[in-house]
Amino acid sequence: PYELMLQLLAKGNDIFTGGREYYSHPNYNGNDKPTIIHQSSATGMQAIPTTGVAQGIKYKEQQMAHSSLFMKGSHYEPSAINHQPIVLCSLGDASVTEGEVSEALQFAALHQLPIIFLVQDNGWGISVTKEEARLTNASEFVKGFGGISRISIDGSDFAQSFEVMKNVVDEVRRERHPFLVCAKVPLLGHHTSGVRKEFYRTEEDLAKHYLDDPKPKLRKKLIELGVTENDLLKIENETAQNVATDFSNAVVAPEPIASTVSDYVFVPTTVTEEKGERSPINNEKVLMVDAAL
């Protein structure tokens, strides 16, 4: 939580972007966790870049199966099925109406890329209801593409979600094809600190969603399985204390240094001038786009 809090508070020690990223859109490149790429804040814009990463993975697998680019952590074994790299693209249900998402789905299906599209369907698109935004849910929508496996689950059921996602991840690692998971989930909080739930949602709608709050569902299931109330309280108290400590430390962490604002904007390059022989020599110059055609 501490690293995410640094990012949320735009602190200089933020390992994602040094405190210069749109909040709650973290990215990460450490060896101890899955890589999270940088994304735009525009709705659905993560779909095309993540599909591009999946395309890159497929290309690397075909051209250089043992590339170091695949390595993650100290136990990587490229020949092991459970170590085959995959991509996960997380989306909200309303974002599926965006053109970029359709492009990504089309491309992933056409080229059979190792990507999972995880759609969290809470029936809202920021302040717009599903009835106002779309005709079908993501699972129904993706049927038209072909080549993409799909499944719908109760995303408020932790056990079901864990089991299904494990199976989906295993299948995509093994079969190397795209998969869409449509998880029906409640909307319990605000969209952002500025788009607050009480601005556009009725008490009846909120009450309906609270019935599917996954936390009490999981708590009830754990007690049925024999976990004691004391054990649960101990976990909750320890977690709350850890979060409070991390937050206190994040609040007092140093701010970004103004003089470093231009760092890492451009990738350093040693190529600063044109060198070499043009072929054919003295040929008429053409536009790059025309040459490609």
In which residue ranges do the predicted regions lie?
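Glycine/aspartate-rich loop-and-adjacent alpha/beta segment that forms the canonical ThDP
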Residues: 171-278
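A general structural motif
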Residues: 127-137, 211, 287-290
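Acidic, glycine-rich active-site loops and adjacent beta-strand->loop/helix elements
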Residues: 91-97, 119-125, 156-159, 185-187
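Cofactor-binding active-site loop characterized by glycine-rich and histidine/acidic residues
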Residues: 1-76, 81-111, 129-139, 143-146
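Short internal beta-strands
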Residues: 112, 116-120
